[in-house]
């Protein structure tokens, strides 16, 4: 039997406008939303008393994501149940059609506690300790890397086995490079606060075009699923970009655990429907459900930084690249002189 918890949040409308006339009506609604939160394995419960048919709607990201029709009940309040498991996580608004001034705002959290994973080091490869790594991705057996900082930002192609540069270009001094990803034989490289993305030919490194970000605040990490791109901006949002529409930001998912939102998602990597993400100033990798935004697991890398040469410019973990043939992850950090090939222990 499901426990029904009355909410302190309710609608009580005694008058409303319809066809420019004021009609006396009463709509009473109570929900099981507690502390403005529900989890995605909960069932939204509405206790409704209305003398007319109603349509409840749920909005997310300014888009309509659910329609909940309710039949009138003349004398008694009735309960209605709606499952939430197919919705994305994050901030939602529940309202009655034609009564958008009356809203229940709530946050949908994940029902799962993130699982903690350890790792095993398979190999270590030397590299320059001057690489301020912002993005990392394999194309076949070749590693591509985006290096940051004003006046030092680069796009490089690397033989990871010996650290030799196979190609490189220096960005203008007023651009701070961030994440990169490869799709349709093009390299997409983000900038930080400049709010533009750069598009290069994969083979020649010739710049083809650029694009504006839209509503995202900054450029942090980026990855792709072969069709769409997924871009972080330092907030809890990961934006979904359409390469067929000049990388237009079509939508976003919000990243949450079972308790709260997660911000500062940095370098991203797409593997088998999951987004693997560094989090700025945290020594680990979040495993994100790309459909709903739930953090399903965390790879604990807390002692990895100790295994590189310690120096005054040594910075945070940042850089995830998945090698599809080797079925392993390559991880590194800003100003690290090593890149580690690791296996996730599940």
Model-derived segments and spans:
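Bacterial signal peptide processing site
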Residues: 18-21
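Surface-exposed, short loops/turns at beta-strand junctions within beta-sandwich domains
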Residues: 83-91
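A short helix->beta-strand "capping" segment at the edge of beta-propeller domains
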Residues: 110-130, 160-166
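Conserved beta-strand positions in repeat-built beta-propeller and related beta-rich domains
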Residues: 145-150, 189-195, 231-235, 277-281, ...
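Short loop/turn segments that connect beta-strands within beta-propeller blades
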Residues: 158-163, 201-205, 243-246, 289-293, ...
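Blade-loop segments of beta-propeller domains
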Residues: 163-200, 206-216
């Amino acid at each position: 039997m499901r426990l029904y918890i009355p909410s302190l949040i309710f609608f009580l409308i005694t008058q409303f406008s319809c066809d420019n006339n004021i009609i006396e009506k009463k709509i009473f609604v109570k929900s099981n939303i507690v502390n403005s939160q529900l989890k995605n394995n909960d069932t939204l419960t509405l206790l409704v008393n209305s003398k007319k048919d109603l349509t409840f709607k749920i909005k997310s990201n300014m888009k309509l994501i659910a329609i909940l029709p309710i039949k009138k009940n003349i004398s008694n309040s009735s309960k209605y149940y709606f499952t939430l498991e197919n919705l994305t996580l994050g901030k939602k608004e529940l309202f009655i059609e034609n009564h958008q001034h009356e809203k229940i705002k709530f946050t949908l959290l994940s029902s799962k506690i993130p699982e903690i994973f350890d790792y095993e080091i398979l190999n270590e490869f030397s590299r320059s300790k001057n690489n301020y790594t912002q993005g990392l991705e394999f194309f076949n057996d070749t590693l591509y890397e985006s290096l940051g900082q004003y006046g030092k930002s680069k796009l490089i192609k690397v033989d990871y086995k010996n650290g030799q540069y196979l190609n490189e270009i220096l960005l203008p001094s007023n651009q701070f490079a961030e994440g990169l990803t490869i799709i349709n034989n093009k390299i997409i490289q983000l900038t930080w606060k400049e709010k533009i993305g750069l598009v290069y030919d994969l083979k020649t490194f010739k710049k083809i075009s650029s694009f504006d970000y839209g509503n995202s605040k900054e450029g942090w990490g980026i990855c792709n699923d072969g069709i769409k791109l997924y871009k972080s901006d330092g907030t809890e949002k990961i934006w979904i970009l359409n390469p067929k529409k000049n990388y237009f930001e079509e939508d976003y998912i919000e990243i949450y655990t079972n308790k709260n939102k997660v911000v500062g998602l940095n370098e991203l990597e797409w593997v088998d429907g999951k987004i693997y993400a560094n989090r700025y100033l945290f020594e680990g990798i979040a495993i994100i459900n790309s459909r709903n935004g739930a953090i399903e697991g965390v790879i604990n890398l807390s002692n990895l930084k100790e295994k590189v040469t310690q120096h005054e410019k040594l910075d945070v973990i940042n850089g995830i690249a998945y090698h599809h043939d080797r079925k392993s992850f390559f991880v590194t950090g800003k100003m690290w002189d090593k890149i580690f090939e690791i296996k996730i222990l599940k």
